[in-house]
Amino acid sequence: MFVKLALAVLPLLSSVLAIDGCTRNATVVSGDTCDSISRKYGVSTYQLALVNDATIDENCDNLQPGQVVCLGIEEHDCTKVYTVVADDTCDYIQQTYGISNETLWSNNPQIDDACDNIYVGEVLCVDTESYTYPQYNETLYNALAYTYLPYCDE
């Protein structure tokens, strides 16, 4: 009984917990994933995970309908995004959006040096302006990346 009550209250609590400087937010609906929210609202998957690392777990499987998530924070809200598809490379993304190597990595610090950890469905910030993000939860990103990487082979 207590567990059911706690689960029912969780979305309400998460919507009450305000993230300092949150500039925009979204309400989770049934079937949402971190990547689908990112695509729907034009926010990078990295940024979504970063600003919600206190409420979204490592596999992004604890989203609850009615839960409010922050999409961006003041001065760190990239809204020019691209969704990775099969066979994408960082070089291709850079050329397509006219962004430098430094800017791509600055706006997507989770990408490794070889750019072999981007995954199909990941939403990247492709703005030509560089954003400086606070420290990110590398464990959360890696859990997302390695959860979806096998689909790159399809």
Regions found by a protein language model. Name each.
Residues 41, 97, 136-144:
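Extracellular/cell-surface secretome signature
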Residues 82-90, 138-151:
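Short, compositionally biased
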Residues 5, 33-36, 47, 62, ...:
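Acidic, Ser/Thr-rich intrinsically disordered and amphipathic helical segments
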Residues 3, 150-154:
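A positional/structural detector of protein chain ends, strongest at the extreme C-terminus
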Residues 11, 15, 27, 53, ...:
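Residue-level signal for mature regions of secreted extracellular proteins and peptides
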Residues 3-18:
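Cleavable N-terminal signal peptides of Sec/SRP-targeted secreted and luminal proteins
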Residues 17-41, 67, 73-97, 154:
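Primarily a LysM-type cell-wall glycan-binding module
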Residues 20, 45-77, 102-138:
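Extracellular LysM carbohydrate-binding repeats and other cell-envelope/extracellular binding modules
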